[in-house]
Amino acid sequence: MSENTNKNSIAKEYYEGGNSPLTDAEWDALYEGLEGIGYTPDSGVRHSFPMMSLKKTFDEDELGSWIASHEGQEVISSPKLDGSAVSILYDKGEFVRATTRGNGKIGIDVSNKMKFLVPEKINFAKKVQIDGEVVAPITIPNARNYAAGSLNLKLERDFIPRCNELRFVAYDLRPHGFIESWSVLLNWLESLGFSTVHSVDSSQYPTDGEVHRIDNIEYWTKQGFTSHHPRGSLAFKIQKEGVVTYLSNVEWQTGKSGVVTPVAILGPVMIGDALVSRATLHNMAHIEELGLEIGCNVEVIRSGEIIPRIVRRVEEK
């Protein structure tokens, strides 16, 4: 089996079944380039408008340069909520369908769950797609996984008890043609009965940075798009302080392609809302560069609040 075939197999389980053999962190660390190999779900629902990703940076200077490159344009920011992205389709004011992000073009129909979280009717006569994030409060351990896992539940009766904990927070409505700015768009979404990234108390939900957008939608659209993201938006992620634990062991995992990758086995530690016990080590050179030994203390972060990574050895005092 080729490496790409193996990635597609894992992708199918991750996107469609919610039964991936990898944790979210391992998935993101090892398969961040999935879109590059062209994965498409075997079946599903096509979004009326693609749900694109965002270009991301951890560098304040890069963010400042990006804002400066659009001199004269107002840039608005909003929290980047960390949940499960979903598009909602309405036609003539009636709820039609809800679809998970999937690969950005095709997702899975979750209408039987989302109908409990969004308005059944809205005061708008045309067909529109409303994009947003299903989130769970930070008081729930692994809130991001809880939100995504809830949408993967097969039966309505299993989902309904979770409705009081879950919330759909809208951040986009398309087509944009009749809306002049993101500020107006978000206000209009609120008037239709939706919580938005501007109205919700983001301190109650997990976030992984900020989203910056050029407010004028006509100008934003003229910046164009890559195959991955719009050029008129930029996500800024804050590198948070790490947590100290100890290196218990190193496991060597051999992939189907024969590539051997070291994985750190850690003393379990909470980082944000997630219990972390494993982290990628990339290769032997990385282990030697950090001077790691079994039993030593290490500082661990979750890059972008997702990927567990050892950043340094911590010497005992």
Segments the model singles out, each with a brief description of its role:
Residues 1-317:
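RNA/tRNA-interacting regions in translation and RNA-turnover enzymes
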